[in-house]
A protein has these predicted regions:
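Glycine-rich phosphate-binding loop signature in dinucleotide/nucleotide-binding domains
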Residues: 133, 137
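Conserved alpha/beta-hydrolase catalytic His-Asp/Glu region
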Residues: 14-75
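Post-His helix in hydrolase/transferase enzymes
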Residues: 120-132
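Flexible "cap/lid" loop of the alpha/beta hydrolase fold
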Residues: 1-16
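Conserved loop-alpha-helix segment in the C-terminal half of the alpha/beta-hydrolase fold
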Residues: 77-114, 120
Length: 137
């Protein structure tokens, strides 16, 4: 059902009232005012052209669904780190990250108080994790 829905998000975004989409889009990806304002600025580029925004978002959802459908074996052969905000409510990212970590044993760092765009909610923490990760390579 999830893949089926992902493939059909473009018309949903095209017909969803723009002001509500703007509100849910900004609140859905970040917990900080800074992160929400960045998302709002990005979305406002498409103010007056919701159709284009829906096309771009729909394309992203479709390619994600197609990749999930193919379920290709792919081994990451370089040092890797998964980072996910505890309050990430964008789709099923929390579930995906848990499963990815479980299957691959790639380290997974949970960011308290952060949403989908955790780097905008907790930039110091993210930068610290990346610096630590890079120093151990």
């Amino acid at each position: 059902m999830e893949i089926w829905l992902l493939k059909r998000m473009e018309p949903v975004y095209a017909h969803y009232p723009w002001k509500l989409l703007l509100k849910s889009g900004t609140k859905g990806v970040a917990t900080s005012n800074y992160g929400r304002n960045l998302m709002k600025e990005m979305m406002l580029v498409y103010d007056g052209d919701q159709h284009r925004y829906a096309q771009i978002a729909g394309h992203g959802f479709r390619i994600l669904a197609e990749a999930m459908e193919k379920d290709l074996p792919y081994e990451i052969k370089c040092p890797s780190l998964l980072i996910c905000g505890i309050k990430d409510h964008a789709g099923s990212c929390i579930r995906y990250n848990r499963e990815w970590h479980r299957k691959t044993k790639i380290p997974l760092k949970w960011i308290e108080g952060a949403g989908h765009n955790s780097n905008t909610d907790k930039p110091e923490m993210i930068n610290s994790l990346i610096e630590e990760f890079l120093s151990n390579i």
